[in-house]
Amino acid sequence: MTAPPVHDRAHHPVRDVIVIGSGPAGYTAALYAARAQLAPLVFEGTSFGGALMTTTDVENYPGFRNGITGPELMDEMREQALRFGADLRMEDVESVSLHGPLKSVVTADGQTHRARAVILAMGAAARYLQVPGEQELLGRGVSSCATCDGFFFRDQDIAVIGGGDSAMEEATFLTRFARSVTLVHRRDEFRASKIMLDRARNNDKIRFLTNHTVVAVDGDTTVTGLRVRDTNTGAETTLPVTGVFVAIGHEPRSGLVREAIDVDPDGYVLVQGRTTSTSLPGVFAAGDLVDRTYRQAVTAAGSGCAAAIDAERWLAEHAATGEADSTDALIGAQR
């Protein structure tokens, strides 16, 4: 049983749980917290729904045997969380203070909201090349997830951009579907581990194009080609591909909390053991903000469920001692 509600100076109720972020992790955390009668306040952000909002077809999410579009899946998750009483707001979070029994969250309109527990589910963003045509054709031939979209390029010629383990793994995986894969890298040396590089080099379907940078992605409604430039000669050529997979890494959206909680050298939030607990009591993290390995909708949803359960248990344990109900320990929001 959680502590009774109190109100802050601006008459906002102090919540049991605030969820920051949407997508599969955030919405699932909201659903489970709502069903546990925690009345979660969820800040989805103005760009809600996460990376799946740019995914045209999702065929590997359990329960949808005929597939579903990314936006449709997010809408279903969102509506399900609403059905059970989650308070969803399309507002961006400006700053947070996560120390002490009461956590504070400041939104872009300057309003301060407080809660006894916070679930972080801001996700991670794929790094992109920022060249003409790339963002315009995202989800229409340009992708950052071979596992998600590789199937749609069966018997087609595609390109993978990158030189690390992720690029080698994506290229190798895509040979299951594609007729050919051209791996484009700006140098002739690779950051990839030897075993991953050798695996790609020994695959007859993979062609290496080194010392080339991407100039633009061609196409009006779908990808029709990839323009590249030779870094030695400056000559430009166009690769006749219908798919472009960008594999130059991901950036966890942890900037909001990076100075407050423990993160790894790349900015992924660290959790304790098999839980979703972070280095701060009452603060939990889920989804791609934590997961640098799988980055799938179903795994993100699972960790969102775990975060809500962890938060519920933590609140129940601390309500008995009154630790989760102190209004004197609020540390002002850091701007």
Swiss-Prot record:
Keywords: Acetylation, Cytoplasm, Disulfide bond, FAD, Flavoprotein, NADP, Oxidoreductase, Phosphoprotein, Redox-active center. One of its GO terms (molecular function) is thioredoxin-disulfide reductase (NADPH) activity. It is found in: Cytoplasm. Its EC number is 1.8.1.9. Phosphorylated on Tyr-32 by PtkA. Disruption phenotype: Essential, a deletion mutant cannot be isolated. TrxB depletion inhibits mycobacterial growth and causes lytic death of the cells. Depletion affects growth-essential processes, including sulfur and DNA metabolism. Partially depleted cells are highly susceptible to thiol-specific oxidizing stress, but not to peroxide and reactive nitrogen species. Depleted cells are highly susceptible to the cell wall biosynthesis inhibitors vancomycin and moenomycin. In vivo, depletion of TrxB results in clearance of M.tuberculosis during both the acute and chronic phases of infection. The modification N-acetylthreonine is found at residue 2. NCBIfam families: TRX_reduct. Essential thiol-reducing enzyme that protects the cell from thiol-specific oxidizing stress. Plays a minor role in defense against oxidative and nitrosative stress. Is essential to establish and maintain infection in mice. PANTHER family: THIOREDOXIN REDUCTASE 1-RELATED-RELATED (PTHR48105). This is Thioredoxin reductase.
